[in-house]
Curated annotation (Swiss-Prot):
Family annotation (HAMAP family): PRAI
A GO molecular-function annotation: phosphoribosylanthranilate isomerase activity
Protein name: N-(5'-phosphoribosyl)anthranilate isomerase
Taxonomic classification: Bacteria, Pseudomonadati, Pseudomonadota, Alphaproteobacteria, Hyphomicrobiales
Pfam families reported for this sequence: PRAI
InterPro entries to which the protein is assigned, alphabetical: Aldolase_TIM, PRAI_dom, RibuloseP-bd_barrel, TrpF_fam
Protein encoded by which gene: trpF
Gene3D superfamilies (alphabetical): Aldolase class I
Keyword Heme: no
Keywords annotated in UniProt: Amino-acid biosynthesis, Aromatic amino acid biosynthesis, Isomerase, Tryptophan biosynthesis
Alphabetical list of CDD domains matching this protein: PRAI
Length: 222
């Protein structure tokens, strides 16, 4: 199965077009005012129109209420919602039922105890995202450039597909995929020159590196 690649936190036409040209499967737009990657509803609408059918548009929110979700959906017209806060399994089910869109639930992992919640979300979400837990209480829930102990995922079995996030760069993504058997990867700060500023060269290097394990496997099988 091809590795899914998501570039998150896109904020400009140039970087969005680059992500699409490079073959990203998903492009993420952040609707969370505390994030340096936050986009207004108007900008989300403008950028969303450029995507067409070249990738899945993902709206990322954090503990958003129904009104905020409805506004973001109306602006971006996403194919998927990503919830990256303290949303409960019941809240995930409610969002899916109300808006009729697939939901990706981000799960913050710091140690073994954080794995307990995974089956609860696996039962209600359409896709899971395993990310590093913020080091500081009240810190941004994602996009911090820190990784967690990937060996913890050896203990995880899910029915739903999942993406790996947290501290991924072009230097470590191939190893991360090999170590975890991740079905996909999600990157934001790892392809930036500054917080919220995507770097075209880093984006290209990341996607090339993420595809390498798959290409090597295909050559070996042939």
């Amino acid at each position: 199965m091809p590795i899914m690649i998501k570039i998150c936190g896109l904020r400009t036409e140039e970087t969005l077009d680059a992500a699409l040209d490079l073959g990203a499967d998903m492009v993420g737009f952040v609707s969370f005012s505390k994030s340096p990657r936050h986009v207004s509803l108007d900008l989300a609408s403008h950028l969303g129109k450029r995507v067409g059918d070249r990738a899945l548009k993902v709206l990322l929110t954090v503990n958003a209420d129904d009104a905020s979700l409805a506004a973001g959906i109306a602006a971006l017209d996403p194919q998927m919602l990503q919830v990256h806060g303290r949303e409960t399994p019941e809240r995930i089910a409610s969002i899916r039922a109300r808006f009729g869109l697939p939901v990706m639930k981000a799960i913050s992992i710091g140690d073994y105890s954080d794995l307990v919640q995974i089956p609860l979300f696996d039962a209600v979400a359409d896709l899971l995202l395993f990310d590093a837990k913020p080091k500081a209480p009240g810190g941004l829930p994602g996009g911090n450039g820190t990784a967690f102990d990937w060996s913890l995922l050896r203990h995880v079995e899910t029915r739903k597909p999942w993406l790996l996030a947290g501290g991924l760069t072009s230097q470590n993504v191939a190893g991360a995929i090999a170590a975890t058997n991740a079905q996909g990867v999600d990157v934001s700060s790892g392809v930036e020159s500054a917080a919220g500023v995507k770097d075209l060269a880093k984006m290209a290097a990341f996607i090339e590196a993420a595809r390498k394990p798959q290409l090597s496997s295909q050559r070996h099988l042939s």
